[in-house]
Amino acid sequence: MQVSVRDNNVEQALRALKKKLQREGVFREMKLKQHFEKPSVKKAREKAEAVRRARKLARKKAQREGAL
């Protein structure tokens, strides 16, 4: 990953880098990889995340249809 530093503004470059890493999911992946996660626990977590995403999508869809 590459971020350009303009006008010696390192703080702005760090913010841009952090935003890119956040979008890529690097911080989340690092947090998950700190400790070993049993395959059964990983499977349950991923299933719960999928259910959460589906509910969120259904909520948004229902809200959009209600507004129309």
Curated annotation (Swiss-Prot):
The keyword Ribonucleoprotein applies. PANTHER family: MITOCHONDRIAL 28S RIBOSOMAL PROTEIN S21 (PTHR21109), SMALL RIBOSOMAL SUBUNIT PROTEIN BS21M (PTHR21109:SF0). The lineage of its organism: Bacteria, Pseudomonadati, Pseudomonadota, Alphaproteobacteria, Rhodobacterales. The keyword Ribonucleoprotein applies. The gene is rpsU. GO terms for cellular component: ribonucleoprotein complex; ribosome. GO terms for molecular function: structural constituent of ribosome. This is Small ribosomal subunit protein bS21. InterPro entries: Ribosomal_bS21, Ribosomal_bS21_CS, Ribosomal_bS21_sf. GO terms for biological process: translation. Belongs to the bacterial ribosomal protein bS21 family. Keywords: Ribonucleoprotein, Ribosomal protein. NCBIfam families: S21p (TIGR00030).
